[in-house]
Amino acid sequence: MSDITDFDREKRLEELVGRYQTPLLHMCYLYLCDQSMAEDALQEIFLKIYRNMDRFRGECSEKTWVMKIAVNTCYSMNHSGWSRFFNRHVTPEMMPDETVQTDDEDKQLVSAVAGLLLKLREVILLYYFQNLKVNEIAETLGISQSSVSGRLKRGRDRLKTMLEGRELDE
């Protein structure tokens, strides 16, 4: 994508927004646990993509590149001073309408995923919600594939425990 004109860059951005806007908003919300912060993150992600289009060399897939920008942006926002001012408890009712279905099981899953530790949540989000492969997640997060596999297993186990506990409560 090097040496692209402003027109080509804007056209390419429109394509990327169309392809990734909804899944990225969903991921950002589950990552940041705040709708306003997720929307801000989404804008920041697409701004970074626009500014850095000419740096994409095809060494990884486009999706991996976009997700790496998204994860890094969410990580930065999550660790900024602003994140301390927001309520970090997520309920499915707080989710942006286009990001979650209203099925009770879906609501329980969203709440459970949001309740995971960040390092487990991010691999679950990238694997199940963004459909990245283990090697793509490893590249996106800058960790080994075995670390990704371990976090996926721990995340699944934790989700299973959380969801089974909720079934018993009802």
Tell what function each PLM region has.
Residues 71, 75, 141-165:
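DNA-recognition helix of helix-turn-helix
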Residues 6, 44-61, 81-82:
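Sigma70-family region 2
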Residues 1-26, 30, 97-98, 110-114, ...:
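N-terminal module of bacterial RNA polymerase sigma factors
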Residues 123-127:
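A short pre-motif secondary-structure segment
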Residues 36, 135, 146-149:
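Residues within helix-turn-helix
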Residues 26, 40-47, 60-72:
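Structural recognition of an alpha-helix C-terminal capping motif at a helix-to-coil junction
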Residues 76, 83-114, 133-135, 168:
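Internal acidic/polar
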Residues 55-57, 68-88, 154:
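Arg/Lys-rich amphipathic alpha helix in sigma70-family domain 2
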